[in-house]
Amino acid sequence: MDPEATGLENIFLRGHLLGMTKGEIEASIDDIAEFTDLGDFLELPMKTYSAGMAARLAFGISTAMQNDILLIDEGIGAGDAAFQEKAHKRIEDLFTRTRIVLIASHSTNLIETFCNRRVELGHGRVERDERI
């Protein structure tokens, strides 16, 4: 994400990096805006966003676009309880349209809720690999 660019410009930037057409990106903007609840903040440079706002936008962009593989690194820990509930629903939807979702998290509850396999690492080595 470019901190000098607006939220809207970052939506286009990330979409282009993912190989989307301008039309595909434009079609996803309303969904991203509604999901993130950023409203007029999408018109402001990202350097004015709080860390939580930036995380919500990054998560909203990544999950609004069609992906074969989605990597989430503590992505749904940002925001209040209402946003986290929206994020959980979004992840549930991702499982129906994304082939592989990889979540890096310290949250046992998150892993047990959304994952069918858990791999735990310690000091760069696999310590546990199990189906859950």
Model segments located where?
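Helical segment within the ABC ATPase nucleotide-binding domain
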Residues: Q84-T96
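Conserved ABC ATPase signature
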Residues: P45-Y49
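H-loop (His-switch) and adjacent beta-strand-loop-beta switch element
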Residues: F114, R118-E130
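A short, proline-enriched helix->beta-strand linker immediately N-terminal to the Walker B motif
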Residues: T63-I72
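H-loop/switch region of ABC-family ATPase nucleotide-binding domains
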Residues: S105-H106
